[in-house]
Swiss-Prot record:
Pfam family, one: DBI_PRT
Top-rank EC class of the record's enzyme: transferase
The entry's keywords: Cobalamin biosynthesis, Glycosyltransferase, Transferase
Record-annotated active site: E330 (proton acceptor)
UniProt-listed Gene3D superfamilies: 1.10.1610.10, 3.40.50.10210
Protein origin, superkingdom: Bacteria
Gene source species: Deinococcus radiodurans (strain ATCC 13939 / DSM 20539 / JCM 16871 / CCUG 27074 / LMG 4051 / NBRC 15346 / NCIMB 9279 / VKM B-1422 / R1)
CDD domains hit by this protein: DMB-PRT_CobT
InterPro entries named in the record: Nict_dMeBzImd_PRibTrfase, Nict_dMeBzImd_PRibTrfase_bact, Nict_dMeBzImd_PRibTrfase_N, Nict_dMeBzImd_PRibTrfase_sf
Record's function text: Catalyzes the synthesis of alpha-ribazole-5'-phosphate from nicotinate mononucleotide (NAMN) and 5,6-dimethylbenzimidazole (DMB).
EC number, as in UniProt: 2.4.2.21
Identification of the protein by name: Nicotinate-nucleotide--dimethylbenzimidazole phosphoribosyltransferase
Catalytic reactions on record: 5,6-dimethylbenzimidazole + nicotinate beta-D-ribonucleotide = alpha-ribazole 5'-phosphate + nicotinate + H(+)
Pathway assignment: Nucleoside biosynthesis; alpha-ribazole biosynthesis; alpha-ribazole from 5,6-dimethylbenzimidazole: step 1/2
């Protein structure tokens, strides 16, 4: 697919320029309302801060977020040839087929498919750069510029132009979902080997040793984990780039770039972005480096089991909602967080104040 690099660069600049911080006045009104609701102060724990943050995203002290969409971007990685995963690259196209499969329960036979059906989210699937001939399917968005990234151990995974193009493709898919009614955007991914680029991105952006942020991914043993750390270390030694877009191009992946575009588009339109795990976290680090206001729109679902995720969340200054030991990806954790965020918004919107309910003791601890 041909790229108009000048137009793409201009479109990205425009997208970044549209991001504004959360509505501080709406958050102040939400905090004031929280203090008047029929409950002891702080009794709803972290739900209270989540509700205030949602007020800032949606610009009202009574947020009413509706639809949710999981946007699963799939891509292959040249670095998989280094043996950094417990699974072969052929799993990526097979899982794309699984996302699109017709099953007795409905569309999709993957974990994210089942969870999305159960918890009320639409699933969108994007070919961001799968190394296979994928069959035609009406539910598949085709955005691939090439079949998999280059091997980041030896060369840049993507060109800067490819990176920007995939970011814009992700933004376009998010726009589609939002136009269809999604107020929660949940980026998800599928790509064998993608915790390796995520580790490289995290190590460079946080300035930490690769061993501290490189985990087992699909479940590699100790020997292969040590090799994976070496691969990340050698990749980082290739170049000293620090510009966020250059870092993403050097060490990232097509699906990571696409997820970043989804996040930026959602924030630009003042929607909530639910972060799943480590790979999504690496995209978020790049995004906040590019546009600090993005942070206000990010809601980490849970701290995943992958080493390095806690460091990402600490750098972002964001608290996860749960810790279930998840490390699957696909957006699964993000979908599981939906009821918590919907519930948090409902407390602001639907609870009565002490005065409204004629309950004595307003403001008491």
């Amino acid at each position: 697919m041909a790229m108009d690099t000048g137009r793409d660069s201009s479109a990205l600049t425009d997208l970044l320029g549209r991001l504004q911080p959360a509505d501080a006045e709406a958050m102040a009104r939400a905090r004031e309302r929280q203090a008047q609701l029929t409950k002891p102060a702080g009794a709803l724990g972290d739900l209270e801060e989540l509700s205030v943050r949602l007020a800032g995203v949606f610009g009202t002290e009574r947020p009413e977020p509706r639809g949710a969409a999981v946007l699963v971007a799939a891509g292959d990685h040249g670095v998989a040839a280094e043996g950094v995963s417990a699974y072969p690259p052929e799993v990526t196209p097979a899982m794309v087929a699984n996302f699109l499969a017709d099953t007795p329960a409905g569309p999709g036979g993957a974990a994210v498919s089942a969870l999305a059906r159960t918890l009320g989210a639409e699933v969108y699937v994007m070919d961001a750069g799968v190394n296979a001939d994928l069959p035609e399917h009406p539910a598949l968005t085709r955005a691939a510029r090439r079949r998999g990234t280059r091997n980041l151990r030896r060369e840049a995974a993507m060109t800067r132009e490819e990176t920007v193009a995939l970011m814009l493709a992700g933004a376009a898919l998010a726009d589609r979902a939002m136009d269809a009614g999604a107020d929660f955007i949940i980026p998800g991914e599928m790509g064998i080997g993608n915790t390796t680029p995520a580790a490289a991105l995290t190590a460079r952006l946080l300035g930490v040793d690769p061993a501290d942020v490189t985990g087992r991914g699909t479940g590699v043993d100790d020997e292969r984990l040590a090799h994976k750390v070496d691969v990340v270390r050698e990749a980082l030694a290739r170049t000293a780039v620090t510009d966020p877009l250059d870092v993403l191009a050097e060490f990232g992946g097509f699906e990571i770039a696409a997820m970043l575009g989804m996040m930026l588009a959602a924030a630009a339109r003042r929607r909530a972005v639910i972060l799943d795990g480590f790979v999504e976290g690496s995209a978020a680090l790049v995004g906040v480096a590019l546009a600090p206001a993005l942070r206000d729109f990010l809601f980490p679902a849970g701290e995943c089991a992958e080493r390095g995720h806690a460091a990402q969340l600490a750098d972002l200054g964001l608290k996860p909602m749960f810790n279930l030991g998840l490390r699957l990806g696909e957006g699964t954790g993000g979908v599981l967080a939906l009821p918590l965020l919907r519930g948090a918004a409902a407390t602001l919107r639907e609870m009565r104040t002490f005065e409204e309910a004629a309950v004595p003791g307003g403001g008491a601890a």
